[in-house]
């Protein structure tokens, strides 16, 4: 192709509603990112105020781009041409390579999309804009292009220098590298949450605009994409269409099956360049690398704890120096961080602005309400891809994943015991120090952990927030409810390795094993 005039109409693609529905969520996200980034590049190069095309407005709002008429793009390019000599502006080699032509955008979406498809014949694409064959190749001509052939040959020329993962398209590598750099350039103006990809921001913004959200009728969980809802609904109906031919284990999502099959093949494609350790999942490699990166970054000279950023280290230093600049005027208690003071003051004011609509219970923090509501809905949004176990809290998932990885990087200097999480080490060390900082105001009993105090206080209040949906029996502790529910389900997860007898509770198994240990 001749390297001459490149305008927005050359780097944009029209879709009808019918064609847009044929794309999966991955292809749609890539389309949004490519078009928005190209538009941003063109505007920055033009250096002037240009009326924004409707397709860009819709994409920024998370709406469907097929609603745009072609006349809008024509109006925008005429506006640009009237202000600048665009041929001179965009004819340079670097500019041309940065701004993809229209067929290249289509080609990229196709080649990336084929990785997610079972067969290339399933991809529903056709050219919409009527152009000459020289400027806009047809679908048949695209199949002969080198980049499109990469999707069949599995050629991935763009490799990440950090972890070695390779990609077929440069843009995918750019997105991926933000995982290592931590860059999240796209920020939501409503809530301040930041994202690595523009498409992720667009999808997130639908939560605020309530534009075409998909709600699960079983548990009320909200999705911004219909395909995500369909996959989620398999949890409720128990559908697991993807079965492992080796062991018969079935999965809801094809990606879970692919990961599982590596157990049988022994494949560990993700290798750490620092120590050579290999992992089955990329997420496990990333977690492992964070520990290595932390060792090289900001380390506390007092206790050796490492941080990825200097601000985290500065906050941590206050633990050792005892600096607590934010003091409560009511009781004199001081805090290291202003946010801690704000939350603490609600104890004195009694403010609990977050109330549960199911049971009326109120909370001083929105996060506590969110966690509480999952008791009623049964929602456990965080899934372990190794064993398909679900968790209500992300921290519980991270803690659990350490079981599969087998890493315990935090070692107690007193007794040598190692832990997966730094918080676990901190809790453990209080055993050696004899520290019990959490006191019950009712009976003066002290506890090492805040969670222990919270559980204990329910004895005085009589509160039993965890009720069984089968028989209505209520419990103080969630763990007690889980044990009770096994009576109804018949589940006995703890099996004796000697005689294969199974038990509902681990304590029952421990007691039983004494029979075999008697000499």
From Swiss-Prot:
- For the modification Asymmetric dimethylarginine, which residues carry it? 75
Query: Which is an annotated Pfam family here?
Result: KRAB
Q: Name one GO molecular function term.
A: RNA polymerase II cis-regulatory region sequence-specific DNA binding
Chain positions of all zinc fingers (C2H2-type): 158-180, 186-208, 214-236, 242-264, 270-292, 298-320, 326-348, 354-376, 382-404, 410-432, 438-460, 466-488, 494-516
Going by the entry's taxonomy, the superkingdom of the source organism is recorded as Eukaryota
Q: Enumerate the UniProt keywords alphabetically.
A: DNA-binding, Isopeptide bond, Metal-binding, Methylation, Nucleus, Repeat, Transcription, Transcription regulation, Ubl conjugation, Zinc, Zinc-finger
Checking InterPro entries in the record gives: KRAB, KRAB_dom_sf, Znf_C2H2_sf, Znf_C2H2_type
Concerning SMART domains, the annotation shows: KRAB, ZnF_C2H2
Q: Which GO terms describe its biological process?
A: regulation of transcription by RNA polymerase II
Question: Where is it localised?
Answer: Nucleus
**Which residues form the Glycyl lysine isopeptide (Lys-Gly) (interchain with G-Cter in SUMO2) crosslink?**
110, 141
Q: Cite the CDD domains for this sequence.
A: KRAB_A-box
Q: Does the keyword tRNA-binding apply?
A: no
Paired cysteines (S-S): none
Q: Taking every annotated instance into account, which residue ranges of this chain make up the domain KRAB?
A: 6-78
GO cellular component terms given for this protein = nucleus
Entry's family note: Belongs to the krueppel C2H2-type zinc-finger protein family.
Its biological function? May be involved in transcriptional regulation.
> What protein name does the entry list?
Zinc finger protein 30 homolog
Organism equals: Homo sapiens (Human)
